[in-house]
Every structure is written in C-alpha cells, then in structure tokens.
C-alpha cells in the first residue's frame, strides 16, 4: 500500500475545495457589479487591476514556493485572504474597495498555483506527476461544478450574496484538507525539481534567468500570453452579453457557463494526464490552442443564450488540457535544475500580461462596438497564438532547454 495514499487523497479533496476559493468570485464578479450599476468597461478595468497584481506576484510566488517548506501554510493563508477580500466587496462594492479586493485576489491566486504544484511534485515526484496533475485538475473541475451548481441555486433563490457565503464555507473545508496532508510525505527538494544527487545541497537562487536561458520555456510563455489575452475575457463577456439582453437570470446563467465547461474539463483532465504520461505535452497544448479560436467564433456569431453550450464545452477542452499540460511541461523542461516553481511562476507572469489586459480590451470594444466585435477581436488573438505555436514549436528540445538552464545558473 502506498504510504502517501492518505496525503494524496486529501490533496485531491483540497483541489476540490479550492476550486471555489482561489479565484475569488470569478465570473460572478461581472454580473454582481452590473447589478450595482457598473458599466462594461469599468468592470474590465477593475478586473485588469487584479490581473496586473497577479502578474507582478507570480514570479516572486514561484520563488517563495521554491524557498519555503511551509507550503501548506501558504495555501491556507491565501485562502483566508481571498474570502476576506470578497466579503469586503459584498459590504462596499465601490471602485476603491473592489479594486483592493481584486488586487488581493490576484496576488493570492498567483501564490496558490505554484504552491499546489510544489506540494504535488513533492509528494509524487517526477514519475508520478503527469497522472497526479490529471487527478488534481479533475478534482478541481469537479469542485467547480459542485460550487457553481450550488451557487446558481442559492443565487437564484437568495441572490448573489449567497455566493459569498458558499465561498467562505469552501475556504474552511480547504483548511481542513490542508491539515490532513502529512508534512513528512512532502520532499521539499523534489518539490523544487532538484535531482536526487543534489537534494539537500545549498539552495539555489530563483531568478528570471530561468526563463531567459531556455528557448522552450520562452516559447511556452509567449504562446500562453496570447492564449490568455484572448481567453480571459470570454467567459465574463459571455455572461455580461446574455444579462445585458435581459434573457437570463444573472446568477443562474453565470453558474451554467461554469458548469458546462467544468463537466467537460473533468474527463479531459483525466485523459490528458494519461496521455501525457506516455506521449508528452506538445500535442495537448496544440489541441488547447486550436479550441480557443473556435470558441470565440461561435460566441461571436451565435447571438443567443444557448451559445453557452458549445462555447463552454470548447473552454472545457482548452482549460482541461492546459491545466495538466502547462505545469507538466514546465516540470519536464526544468527537471533537475532546482527551479521548477520559479519557472512556472515566470511562465505564469508572462501569460498574466495577456490575462490582465484581456478584460479591459474586451470591455472597451464591447462598449463602443458591441459584444460581437469584442468576440471577433478575441478570436483573432487566439488564431495568432496558434500560429505562433505552430511556427516555432519543437517537440523534442526539452532536454536542451534544461541543460541551458542548469548551465546558466551555475
């Protein structure tokens, strides 16, 4: 019997509970603010502030994960801070308070991601990472389905404030899960990506040279930046578009947009973990990048609330694959360097530039030219991401990238 089975079970449950916590209100933020009289571009601006804060925090967050052993504490404190910021927004949804809440959520979200990746790698090691990443993502998406279903029902009967209460409950459950993961099951040297022969040695300093010295990592970061510049605004924009036409209940429709995508993500993540274990991550990323422009075209052309079905099914494919492929690809590229978490943080920082700008860009276009034009712009960016990846990607240069990183950091 695997002596770490208990910790792995609680790690899965942790991913389930964090699904409703780590991103704050997520797509519910847009419809919540619209209910308080906010314009589409103002919503985009405040969401962009949160994205910028997260972008600036991701590389230090990766360095923190590489450096500290108290990864469980980092995740726990982050969960509490996200809920506190969201409850503050419920009390006073003015611009200053909303901006502060989103900045805090962005920073905490940047920290939780690498911390969970570090915990996972520290428990299962490189050999077990692809399959466990798939399980992590499947549990995370299942948690999103559960939370969105409950949030939609609660919001329908008691209004959007019920969503805030649900988030607080899930945060408490996350703390319980963290407390049941045994510290002794976490190898903190392996969690950083050190080779066994280097484990226990002098800690290496995490640095931006990790990104600059590896062409595969730079390519991955560029593709992800364009992907998120297109993707980040699509779900909030879909919800705002439907609500603005008066054809849908805000809480219920937003919940449905989440549920449809997450139901697709669960099997996608499980299959992606198994596929990556045998074939690697290149094809998974390619398929994810292909799904995004298709999603944007459907959303822009089909002016109906029912568009959420194909649009969010395609979102489930893209997000389900990347949730497994991105951390797995970074871990494989940087294996043995001792800088996996800072590498993941660096890639996340670059992609966050796109994610931070996406809501503001889409909000401005939607206000002045309509929602169809906004979806067209996002679709064009998605096609550019696919072109860049197809033009530059090389399947088998991970080893060369890892060697360049190790040499640069000696």
Where are each of the predicted segments found?
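Structural signature of the two symmetry-related core transmembrane helices
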Residues: 73-87, 283-297
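Symmetry-related core transmembrane helices of the 12-TM Major Facilitator Superfamily/SLC fold
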Residues: 163-179, 375-390
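Loop-to-transmembrane helix entry
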Residues: 39-49, 247-263, 339-342
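Helix-loop boundary and gating motifs at the non-cytosolic
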Residues: 2-51, 218-219, 228-245
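Cytoplasmic helix-loop-helix junction between adjacent transmembrane helices
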Residues: 103-142
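Juxtamembrane intracellular "pre-TM" segments in multi-pass secondary transporters
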Residues: 1-5, 185-220, 405-410
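Helix-to-loop junctions at the C-terminal end of transmembrane segments
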Residues: 57-70, 268-280
């Amino acid at each position: 019997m695997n002596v770490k089975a208990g910790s792995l079970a609680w790690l899965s449950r942790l991913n389930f509970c964090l699904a409703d916590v780590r991103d704050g209100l997520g797509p519910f933020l847009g419809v919540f603010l619209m209910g308080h009289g906010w314009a589409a571009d103002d919503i985009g601006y405040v969401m962009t502030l949160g994205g910028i804060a997260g972008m600036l925090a991701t590389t230090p967050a990766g360095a923190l994960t590489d450096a500290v052993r108290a990864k469980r504490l980092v995740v726990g404190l982050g969960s509490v801070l996200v809920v506190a910021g969201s409850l503050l927004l419920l009390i006073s949804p003015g611009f200053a308070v909303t901006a502060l809440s989103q900045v805090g959520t962005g920073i905490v979200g940047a920290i939780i991601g690498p911390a969970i990746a570090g915990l996972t790698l520290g428990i299962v090691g490189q050999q077990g990472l692809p399959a466990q990443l798939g399980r992590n993502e499947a549990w995370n998406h299942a948690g999103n389905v559960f939370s969105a279903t409950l949030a939609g029902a609660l919001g329908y009967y008691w209004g959007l404030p019920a969503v805030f209460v649900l988030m607080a409950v899930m945060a408490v459950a996350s703390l319980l899960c963290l407390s049941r993961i045994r510290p002794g099951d976490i190898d903190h040297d392996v969690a950083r990506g050190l080779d066994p022969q280097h484990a226990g040695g002098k800690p290496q300093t995490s640095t931006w040279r990790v990104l600059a010295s590896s062409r595969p990592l730079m390519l991955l970061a560029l593709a992800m930046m364009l992907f998120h510049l297109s993707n980040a605004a699509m779900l909030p924009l879909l919800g705002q578009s439907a609500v603005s036409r008066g054809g849908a209940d805000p809480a219920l429709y937003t919940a449905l947009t989440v549920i449809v995508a997450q139901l697709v993500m669960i099997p996608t993540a499980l299959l992606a973990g198994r596929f990556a274990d045998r074939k690697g991550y290149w094809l998974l990323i390619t398929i994810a990048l292909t799904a995004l422009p298709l999603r944007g075209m459907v959303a822009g052309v089909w002016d109906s609330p029912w568009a959420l079905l194909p649009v969010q099914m395609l979102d489930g494919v893209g997000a389900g694959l990347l949730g497994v492929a991105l951390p797995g690809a970074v871990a494989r590229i940087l294996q043995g360097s001792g800088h996996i978490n800072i590498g993941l943080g660096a890639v996340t920082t670059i992609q966050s530039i796109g994610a931070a700008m996406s809501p503001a860009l889409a909000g401005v276009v939607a206000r002045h030219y309509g929602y169809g034009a906004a979806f067209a712009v996002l679709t064009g960016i998605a096609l550019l991401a696919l072109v860049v990846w197809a033009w530059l990607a090389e399947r088998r240069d991970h080893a060369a990238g890892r060697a360049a990183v190790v040499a640069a950091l000696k």
